[in-house]
Amino acid sequence: MTGVFDSLAADMHSNHMPSSSYHSLHKSQESPTLPVSTATDSSYYTNQQQQQHCGAVSPYGQLGSYQFHGAAINGISYSTKSYDLSYTGSYSSYGPYGTSPSPPHNDQEKEDCEPEVRMVNGKPKKVRKPRTIYSSFQLAALQRRFQKTQYLALPERAELAASLGVTQTQVKIWFQNRRSKFKKMWKSGEIPSDQLPVGSESSPCSSPSASTATWDFGPHQRLQGATNGSALQSSNSASSPSPFLSNYSWYQTSNSAPHLQSNPLLQQHHLHHHPPAPISAGTIF
């Protein structure tokens, strides 16, 4: 009885061994990408562990080229191909953070741009520029020019500034201050009317247009204009008849005829406003 069981167990064991070898061969053929563990696999895992260890020490260090190890499966060999994974070129251009020095603040230029403003009691206050000190020669030349005219045109101001060796702005400011001072002195009565400069007969600091308006006509032209105005007024008063005589047409024609003949302009004006009355036979006889 035991011999029968032993023979059955031996048969089952012999049948199981080919089937297991068949299954192992079939599985290896189904997945050819999974190579059999060889000595190269052990070296691959060893190199990978060493690279991981180096990467933990220097995360951005130089990485060597990674080479894929091929293996022959069922007599088919795969060519090896290397991949360059070095990141040293891309990270070398970026330096460590915070090492580059920041550009210095140009406080000197800011002080030069705004030298006239400073803080006084917590409030900004402009510092006045130093006053221009003129020499005696410059003051005498400016005063002489001010006696001639109180206002300077742009070419005159440029010429005066060039002759005195000052800027045009300084000449303009000096004339402004001098006009203001002269106006105050004239209002207070410190300056008599005979010492007024030329062009300021009516009031000090008058504009050039107002001062030159009185120079357009000479004294003889003013006198002639006044006599013409008085003659015109007298002629108008003489030519106007009384209300009593205005009813008669013969008085108007006889009285106004000599005057109208002497002045043709007045004759045209008179004929335009007062046409001559028709002469009838009753007035002649």
Curated annotation (Swiss-Prot):
PROSITE patterns: HOMEOBOX_1, HOMEOBOX_2. Gene3D superfamilies: Homeodomain-like (1.10.10.60). Residues 17-47, 96-115, 188-238 are annotated as: Disordered. Residues 200-214 have a biased composition (Low complexity). Residues 30-47 have a biased composition (Polar residues). Keywords: Angiogenesis, Developmental protein, Differentiation, DNA-binding, Homeobox, Neurogenesis, Nucleus, Sensory transduction, Vision. Pfam families: DLL_N, Homeodomain. It is found in: Nucleus. The keyword Phosphoprotein does not apply. PANTHER family: HOMEOBOX PROTEIN, HOMEOBOX PROTEIN DLX-2. GO terms for cellular component: nucleus. Residues 127-186 bind DNA. InterPro entries: Distal-less_Homeobox_TF, Distal-less_N, HD, HD_metazoa, Homeobox_CS, Homeodomain-like_sf, HTH_motif. One of its GO terms (biological process) is cell differentiation. Belongs to the distal-less homeobox family. Involved in the Notch signaling pathway as Notch ligand. Activates NOTCH1 and NOTCH4. Involved in angiogenesis; negatively regulates endothelial cell proliferation and migration and angiogenic sprouting. Essential for retinal progenitor proliferation is required for suppressing rod fates in late retinal progenitors as well as for proper generation of other retinal cell types. During spinal cord neurogenesis, inhibits V2a interneuron fate. GO terms for molecular function: DNA-binding transcription factor activity, RNA polymerase II-specific; RNA polymerase II cis-regulatory region sequence-specific DNA binding. Expression restricted to anterior ectodermal derivatives, namely the ventral forebrain, the cranial neural crest and the cement gland. Also expressed in the developing eye. The keyword Plastid does not apply. This is Homeobox protein DLL-4.
